[in-house]
Amino acid sequence: MVPLYTDPVRVARMNNEIPQYRESKRANIACKKAIENLLAERFDGMRLHGDCAKELCDEFGADRVGWVLACTVQHFSWDGRFRHHNKLWADEFLIPTDPDDRTTDYCVNYHPEIVNGLIDQYREYVQTLEEENEHDIGLC
């Protein structure tokens, strides 16, 4: 799995990390496309079927899926259809805002209410993972 690169492109240039930046950005775009494809396949007009968040996290990693979803919400922050609690969650991510970073390349282009459903599913899945890890640590 490709590591998530979260610094802006100007930092990548300064640190000679452009290859890592580009590889991560390609993975972000692939994740965005996978999200859009999964939503198209699994949303029946009323609900999102299956364990979409888990499948995406298994393929791309929870960090990347969260990054792409948060970037989407931040980019469309003006859209009142994104739920307030998801906007607050997305604001916790330090997504680069410089136009050179072109973060819009990996913003999910889907109806906000359906994306809200996936974000809720993702957040619940990540919380479950965190609780399992806490439980495992307590057993040591």
Enumerate the predicted regions with their spans.
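Charged, low-complexity eukaryotic segments
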Residues: 1-22, 106-122
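Compositionally biased non-globular segments, especially hydrophobic aliphatic-rich helices
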Residues: 15, 30-33, 37, 56, ...
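Short terminal alpha-helical segments
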Residues: 7-46
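A detector of low-complexity, intrinsically disordered, Ser/Thr/Gly/Pro/Ala-rich segments
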Residues: 4, 12, 33, 70, ...
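Acidic, low-complexity, intrinsically disordered interaction modules
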Residues: 46-124
